[in-house]
Amino acid sequence: ETKSGMVLIIGYMNKDALDQTILTKQGHYWSRSREVLWKKGESSGMVHNVDDILIDDDQDSIWLKVTIEGLGASCHVGYKSCFYRSVNKIDNGEVTLNFTETEKVFDPEVVYPGADNPTKL
């Protein structure tokens, strides 16, 4: 996110997704599981408006700095970022996840009624 510097998502792009992102200045991505080009916010209204596009040194990774429309979240389960948990290792070797975001921005059942949620909580 442009304002906070927060990483919102890791998305995949093909040439069409990159072309559409540059053309429209809105985040477009390639869904590897559905094999379809999609625009972030197409169904939720939480569009990624692109403020800047950065390319890494060997030109195989792209970082979009974005401003989010609508409710201001990027994660389909309701959090601002898809990275809302951190790994915590406990002394006995058990690994747990700690929530770094404790409040959801929206209720996914309201925004995506009837949609399956593949995320493990």
Predicted feature descriptions by range:
Residues 1-121:
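Flexible "arm" and connector segments at domain edges
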